[in-house]
Amino acid sequence: MAYHLLQRNRNGGLNLAKALNEAMTHIGHCNACRTFTEEEECTICKNPRRQISGQLCIVEMPEDIQAIEQTGQFSGRYFVLMGHLSPLDGIGPREIGLDLLQQRLEQESFHEIILATNPTIEGDATANYIAEICHLYNVKVTRIAHGIPVGGSLEMVDGTTLSHSFAGRRDFLL
């Protein structure tokens, strides 16, 4: 990309540099959920309708919020970990903000915590750790389903995903 901008679009490169500088200067983290925002609280956290559901969805990264929002299936609030537990990499509970999550659970009332970490070993370990914390607050804890993607074929799915699909099966309603 750098070569292209230098050879063919220097003004575009300058505009990109200016936009990146603006973003780095003016965008920070939401005080409530930790996603990126230009204000102290993001638009989701400021929305009073989001509090009605009593649900808190915990995700690994800010872009996970966008993916969930595009489905239109969730109308609660979020908490962004900014990663997952990875002790070998020196990433423990404090590095992903679990102390801040506990503060939030103490200050706010939730009916359900939805764990939407990635379906990886680290994501599962993080979800299990968070579930233990949440049970201290007597709140319902659920995990998003994992399984076969729409349009996927069984022969192309790995054994772990297929096992999760069988374990998470549900009644077929007509």
Curated annotation (Swiss-Prot):
Keywords: DNA damage, DNA recombination, DNA repair, Metal-binding, Zinc, Zinc-finger
CDD domains: TOPRIM_recR
Domain Toprim stretches: 54-149
Entry superkingdom: Bacteria
SUPFAM superfamilies found in the cross-reference section: Recombination protein RecR
One Pfam family named in its UniProt record: RecR_C
Listed GO MF terms: DNA binding; zinc ion binding
GO BP terms, alphabetized: DNA recombination; DNA repair
ZnF (C4-type) intervals: 30-45
InterPro entries reported in the protein's UniProt record: DNA_Rcmb_RecR, Rcmb_RecR, Rcmb_RecR_Znf, TOPRIM_dom, TOPRIM_RecR
Family indicated by similarity: Belongs to the RecR family.
Function: May play a role in DNA repair. It seems to be involved in an RecBC-independent recombinational process of DNA repair. It may act with RecF and RecO.
Protein name, entry field: Recombination protein RecR
Gene name in the database record: recR
